[in-house]
């Protein structure tokens, strides 16, 4: 566990999560600014969030996995895909990155366009219960897309994971904006809420909904649909950060990379 945390690769991954989340939040929230001469549309905001997540997943995904989302990180922990310490460090990096991205946007945007900095809220008479279920469903489909498109066990061509994930985020926003402004990501909700000091009584919705939705997707995907044939000791080693994959796993990783490179050209 200590070896993992002290490695250069681990530190780079944590920084990549911070940077990717910062950029994602900056561009996502920036698309929702209410400029007097050009009010944002639902399509514009949806595409911006999708393009931002897809771009960062493509750019920094090879370094950290490109989570940029506490719900996804916790779901991967539930699915026994990452170590406990990695999850903790990623969560901190994501939350700090989200605050930094929102802070930069707040400093750049003029007062008349800044408004509430796109803080998530319950819209159109949506109740807290309805909002939680909506966020669960929205994040559930995102998490399934992430798990499937990045599964190293898949040998058939899967196209671009970054594109798939970007489209999944766009899809979620096209529906979710009408309910909650669409979170699907506790960091995205937390960052602007901190900068604007606007924690509503329903802020918990944007944590519970996405986390439960993503965790449910992890249980279904990693334990029911496509379970890993790992021993208990291997699962504990993954959780501790001491697991070392065998050569067959590494070879399958290389084959998948070659497949993805071919489909990208």
Swiss-Prot record:
Tell me where the transmembrane regions lie: 13-33, 40-60, 88-108, 127-147, 159-179, 204-224
| Superkingdom of source | Eukaryota
Motif NPA 2 mapped to chain: 185-187
One GO biological-process annotation of the entry reads: protein homotetramerization
The residues that carry sugar chains are: 124-125
GO CC terms: apical plasma membrane; cytoplasmic vesicle membrane; plasma membrane
Membrane topology, from the record: Multi-pass membrane protein
Give the record's keywords alphabetically: Cell membrane, Cytoplasmic vesicle, Glycoprotein, Membrane, Repeat, Transmembrane, Transmembrane helix, Transport
The record's listing under InterPro entries reads:
Aquaporin-like, Aquaporin_5, Aquaporin_transptr, MIP, MIP_CS
Q: Catalysed reaction(s)?
A: H2O(in) = H2O(out)
Which compartment or compartments is the protein found in?
A: Apical cell membrane; Cell membrane; Cytoplasmic vesicle membrane
Q: How does it assemble?
A: Homotetramer; each monomer provides an independent water pore. Interacts with TRPV4; the interaction is probably indirect and regulates TRPV4 activation by hypotonicity.
Name of this protein: Aquaporin-5
- Source species of the chain: Ovis aries (Sheep)
């Amino acid at each position: 566990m200590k070896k993992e945390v002290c490695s250069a690769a681990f530190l780079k991954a944590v920084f990549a999560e911070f940077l990717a989340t910062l950029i994602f939040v900056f561009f996502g929230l920036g698309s929702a600014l209410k400029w007097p001469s050009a009010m944002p549309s639902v399509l514009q905001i949806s595409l911006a969030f999708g393009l931002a997540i897809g771009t960062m997943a493509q750019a920094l995904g090879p370094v950290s996995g490109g989570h940029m989302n506490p719900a996804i990180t916790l779901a991967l922990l539930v699915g026994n895909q990452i170590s406990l310490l990695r999850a903790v460090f990623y969560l901190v990096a994501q939350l700090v990155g989200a605050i930094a991205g929102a802070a930069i946007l707040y400093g750049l945007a003029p007062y008349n366009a800044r408004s509430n900095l796109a803080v998530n809220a319950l819209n159109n008479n949506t109740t807290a219960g309805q909002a939680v279920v909506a966020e669960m469903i929205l994040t559930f489909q995102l998490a399934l897309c992430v798990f499937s498109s990045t599964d190293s066990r898949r040998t058939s061509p899967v196209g671009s994971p970054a594109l798939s994930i970007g489209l999944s985020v766009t899809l979620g926003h096209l529906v979710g904006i009408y309910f909650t402004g669409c979170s699907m990501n506790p960091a995205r909700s937390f960052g602007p809420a901190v900068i604007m000091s606007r924690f509503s009584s329903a802020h918990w919705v944007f944590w519970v909904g996405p986390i439960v939705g993503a965790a449910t997707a992890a249980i279904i995907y990693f334990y029911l649909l496509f379970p890993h044939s790992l021993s208990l000791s291997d699962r504990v080693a993954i959780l501790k950060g001491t697991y070392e994959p065998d050569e067959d796993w590494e070879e399958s990783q290389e084959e998948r990379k070659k497949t993805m490179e071919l489909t990208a050209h």
